[in-house]
Amino acid sequence: MAGRRLARASISAVGVWLLCALGLQATEAELPSAPAELPGGAACLSRFTSGVPSFVLDTEASVSNGATFLGSPTARRGWDCVRSCCTTQNCNLALVELQPDGGEDAISACFLMNCLYEQNFVCKFAPKEGFINYLTQELYRSYRELRTRGFGGSRIPRIWMGIDLKVQLQKPLVLNEADNTDWHLLQGDSDVRVERKRPEEVELWGLKEGTYLFQLTRTDSDQPEETANLTITVLTAKQTEDYCLASYKVGRCRGSFPRWYYDPKEQICKSFTFGGCLGNKNNYLREEECMLACKDVQGISPKRHHPVCSGSCHATQFRCSNGCCIDGFLECDDTPDCPDGSDEATCEKYTSGFDELQNIHFLSDKGYCAELPDTGFCKENIPRWYYNPFSERCARFTYGGCYGNKNNFEEEQQCLESCRGISKKDVFGLRREGSIPTVGSAEVAIAVFLVICIIVVLTILGYCFFKNQRKEFHSPLHHPPPTPASSTVSTTEDTEHLVYNHTTQPL
């Protein structure tokens, strides 16, 4: 009797489980999720933060600072946009525009960006409802560290702070920097020597091709100690081709951003106008960077490499429709390089996507009021005022005389009038982040459905088991005669403080 009851319970449980499995299969068929081992799978999704809502990218300011537009793929949901970011080289920001009345996570547009320029976070944002920003964890940490530093370690030359400085092999490499700064080698050939012959110059001897990581520490008797990291990359001959000998590339997008490129014929850096996307590495924000990377370089533009049609493409390469590989910067340069011409076939998607991103309007034109005060790259001592959105007041800082940002006023009253109404709610990343859609709403429904099915099956089995035990306890004790078919049935059950520093020194 007990065996029959348990068998009936098992059949019922199996029946429920089969119904659940069929329902799950139907749900999965509707909206499949990417496997964890694929580039757009769960391992990729875990690299991103939860979405930062109600802010949109200030495209003009971001690209002017060095951010790069990477594309605008078609996507139905926010997390589809993130998956596209996972499979796009250098993508660290997926910006989505929500679809009005489209349901949870339904979107109308997806934009992919690289918000790093030489390891510095350079994207700017403005408050606007209807948008969500998904950043990689690494990028978000970089942003939080930038905010936490306040003035960003202003007594250490900002031109060197946290960046990857490209240089030619020189004996020695001479850099301008502030006095009282100690250099400590963290990574690279230990034969390198740091010498100081002038108060505001440092000489690096023994550099070889490769990468060096230095920690700069500024110590003053009247100020707290400050540190910053500097990466120096001594370019190889192959890298020099890309950074110095390649012809400058405006790109397909129709923006207008001043940049510098190196002209190896005249051995000087020249200005040009960058369109905003699909550039190459001979593209610098500042003339000083350009000259340091390409000092005294001579030569001609490298020959165009033939497509490689065997093996898989590297991350820096463009994959042609027929499977061949070409250098990534050859995409959309008005010259077909793929045998099938596919590198020039879909360039309009970049143009239209960037135009759409540029045409997103936001009400506030006071985004600079939420920026940290910037002393710039020069070393003058000019008293200025900056606006603090946390206190909603203006405070003094010392401006170095060049570069910097617009949160820079000659008079306190001018500062207050220009930034009236700006508060901490206008600072990107401070508002409560949206829920983490590590899976889409369909995947969430699947998970809930599975849990319910498991609970139902376990409840049926448990109920039948205890009911059977109770009946056996109340029945007379007797031992039925053994039969050859009798057997024993056993069951086993396996079950982030942002600060504004009020003391700044010039660079």
UniProtKB/Swiss-Prot annotation:
Disulfide partners: C244-C294, C253-C277, C269-C290, C320-C338, C332-C347, C369-C419, C378-C402, C394-C415
Residues carrying the site annotation Reactive bond: R254, G255, K379, E380
Pfam families: K319L-like_PKD, Kunitz_BPTI, Ldl_recept_a, MANEC
InterPro entries hit by this protein: Ig-like_fold, Kunitz_BPTI, Kunitz_BPTI_sf, LDL_receptor-like_sf, LDLR_class-A_CS, LDrepeatLR_classA_rpt, MANSC_dom, MANSC_N
Major localization listed first in the record, in broad terms: secreted
Domain BPTI/Kunitz inhibitor stretches: 244-294, 369-419
GO molecular function: serine-type endopeptidase inhibitor activity
Annotated LDL-receptor class A domain residues: 312-348
UniProt keyword list: Cell membrane, Cytoplasm, Disulfide bond, Glycoprotein, Membrane, Protease inhibitor, Repeat, Secreted, Serine protease inhibitor, Signal
Glycosylated sites: N229, N501
Superkingdom of the organism of origin: Eukaryota
Biological process terms in GO annotation: branching involved in labyrinthine layer morphogenesis; cellular response to BMP stimulus; embryonic placenta development; extracellular matrix organization; negative regulation of neural precursor cell proliferation; neural tube closure; placenta blood vessel development; positive regulation of glial cell differentiation
Localization terms from the record: Secreted; Cytoplasm; Cell membrane
Domain MANSC: 51-134
Signal peptide range in chain numbering: 1-29
SUPFAM superfamilies: BPTI-like (SSF57362), LDL receptor-like module (SSF57424)
Function: Inhibitor of HGFAC. Inhibits serine protease activity of ST14/matriptase in vitro. Inhibits serine protease activity of TMPRSS13, via the BPTI/Kunitz inhibitor 1 domain.
UniProt name for this protein: Kunitz-type protease inhibitor 1
Lineage of the species this protein comes from: Eukaryota, Metazoa, Chordata, Craniata, Vertebrata
Gene name of the encoded protein: Spint1
